[in-house]
Amino acid sequence: IFIFIIYSLIAVLWSSDKIFALEYVKKYYHFLIIPIIFTSLKKEYIDKVFSTFLLGMLISEITSYGIFFELWTKEGISPNDPSPFMDHSNYSTYLAFTVFILMYKIIYTDDFKWKIAYSIFFLFSTSNLFLNGGRTGQFSFLIALCLIGFLNFKNKLKAVVLFISLGTTIFVSAYNLSPVFKDRFDYFLHDVEVMINEKDFSNSFSLRVALWISGLEASKHNLIFGSGIGDERENANYILQKFNISNDNFKQETENSIDFHNMYVQYIVQLGIVGLIIILLIFYLLFKLDIRDKVYKNLLIIFLILYFCHSMLGNSFHINQSM
């Protein structure tokens, strides 16, 4: 991660707006907590960290349900999308990770009373995941659920069938019981349909697809080292014009900047193949961490799957609520 930050600082040298580029890199400050955790966190405290995280999520979920049932209000938050303390994409991803932590708590906790408590919390969290409008976390959750069988089952075929069945059951239940999830999923299907049939890239998902295609095309002009931070628009404009996308759809703090709503596209444009390789190495090295405790190793892999999927729909390294 620190090699990535150093390389980003070097990339400021070939960025046209160096003040903006430095401000952009400065937002990676939240990673400074990593060496503190690495040097200070003892193994016996890890479970307490997870418990504290779950407590924080419980508070968020109670607040979310209160907004949904209109027991209380929060400025700028609609009952139709009750994500109380962060945007729904990040909140839904946190909820997805919460559900998996609770799943392991239920399996490995011996105390029957705690099993019941965790089971109720599990249902509480799963319902909340599909009540809010964050499709990112919802689909990341379903993908991770299908892959999790490989972590614990020797019979891989049986595991895949079991977890795909479970994922399908959760999806069908959410579609029929959650108006928010049903509306957003129907809108997603409509968006894809008009994108394919009418070449209309003006809606939520199709706009992202247009940005991804434009970014990949733009990256070819500075493939090795990238165009620099804040200069993403330089080679993407003519592609965006083909999709009839106006500048209002991606206004940023500097004239030449674009948020491609995909971390991998963003960094291959900004930092080239070199930057993208560094990003992928971060995931690989985290995956290869020598964690002997099976539960923590599985949770790490689940976390990486969720984070990888989340990053496909947003620049997750560059937000203060980054996981």
Language-model segments: residues:
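A membrane-periplasm/extracellular boundary helix in multi-pass inner-membrane enzymes
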Residues: 152-198, 213-221, 229, 238
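Membrane-interface micro-motifs in multi-pass membrane enzymes
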Residues: 23-26, 83-98, 135-137, 260-263, ...
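Aromatic-anchored transmembrane helix interface
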Residues: 2-4, 18-41, 52, 57, ...
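Long extracytoplasmic/lumenal interhelical loops at the membrane interface
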Residues: 198-217, 221, 225-271
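Active-site-proximal inter-transmembrane loops
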Residues: 72-89, 123, 248-262, 267
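Alpha-helical transmembrane segments of multi-pass inner-membrane proteins
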Residues: 9-10, 45-76, 86-154, 162-163, ...
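Membrane-interface helix caps and helix-loop-helix hairpins in membrane proteins
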Residues: 13-23, 130-132, 312-318
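Hydrophobic transmembrane alpha-helices and their immediate junctions
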Residues: 146-150, 156-161, 269-306
